[in-house]
Amino acid sequence: MEKQEQQKVSRLVFVLIPFQGHINPMLQLATILYAKGFSITIIHPQFNSPNSSNHPEFTFIPISDNLPKSQVSAGDLFGIVSALNKNCEGPLTECIQEMLKAEDPHDRISCIVYDSTMYFSQSVADHLKLPGICVRTSPAATMLAFAVFPCLHEQGYISFLGKV
């Protein structure tokens, strides 16, 4: 029986958030899917970029995040996440549109796989009529915390700004 070279016939675009504990799970998933025959493109903000030399089989594309150094150095995690979601939507849309223009029919974009913290990615996927898959890179125990928040709010233990 002849061993045939596996041809990559479909591309997955991964959108990473540049935080510890989020990059590795996404790259691990990308590695598994690469082994199953998918081509992988990693799109990431310029801030805290992953080391592309650790995964030479992937295509890494940085996009502008327009994060001011003062915001990053202040360590305001929620502010950084909010700014990334606001600032990266346009650059991600432009990047994927360019990929679609140059698309090889044997290497078409099948899906955008994104970290749940980069929630703007679904809007980009919808706009470009591509499927989007949201991946929660947080431990399963955090799901329990999210489930309990409304109850804690109702009992007056915590409060939220705006609607819950």
Question: Could you say what each language-model-derived stretch is?
Answer:
Residues 1-164:
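Glycosyltransferase specificity loop/lid
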